[in-house]
Amino acid sequence: SALTGVYGLEQIPANMIERVEVMRGGGSALFGSSAIAGTINIITKEPMRNSAQIAHSLTMIGGSRPDNNTTVNASLVTDDHKAGIYLFGQGRHRASYDHDGDGYSELGKLEAKTLGFRSYLKTSNYSKLTFEYHNISEFRRGGNLLDLPPHETDITEQTDHQINGGGLKFDLFSRDYHHRLNVYRRR
């Protein structure tokens, strides 16, 4: 829906998500001082086996306005499963859509590209180093008179994001796997 764009949920390609963790309440403040009501952790996929996938969809919004979405992902894992990498990408191009013909878009124009990877290296039978990175480039524009600069229109809704993020994590397990030490850094 258009509401997902407001909250930026469309910025995260579904083909890179393994699971979503939701933590409610004050205990989530462990993730930062602003997380007093809760957090949502999106866990990206880890490579398990060699694979590749390409998908493309073309949807016509209202039967006339195109929404193109292309996703690519691949994973490579060594034969001994001590190292692996998962690569993902998405490109999406959606035209603006004016449902009621009043000159104002109900769905804004969208140009988005996402690229990233998650890799691991098992440094021993009881330890693992994980590194991940992603880049999200997204431009959204809605309102009216979309061919004019934003300051020359009656109403403009516009965002332009360049997001780089990543993380480095080290896991150390006890020999009986009952205990784990986890050290991580995210940006």
Residue ranges and their predicted role:
Residues E10-Q11, L30, V77:
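A general structural signal for stabilizing positions within well-ordered secondary structure
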Residues S1-R24:
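Short acidic/polar hinge/loop motifs at secondary-structure boundaries
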Residues S1, G27-L30, R94:
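Short beta-strands and strand-coil junctions in structured, solvent-facing domains, enriched
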Residues T4, N15-I17, A35-T39, S51, ...:
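Extracytoplasmic
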Residues N41, R49-S57, N73-E157:
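Periplasmic-side early beta-strands and strand-to-turn transitions of outer-membrane beta-barrels
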Residues S51-M60, G91-R92, G166-L168, V183-R187:
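Transmembrane beta-strand segments that form the barrel wall of outer-membrane beta-barrel proteins
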Residues K122-E138, I155-R187:
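Face-selective signature of the C-terminal outer-membrane beta-barrel domain
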Residues S34-I36, P66-T70, E111-K113, D160-G166:
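Residues that define the transmembrane beta-barrel architecture of outer-membrane proteins
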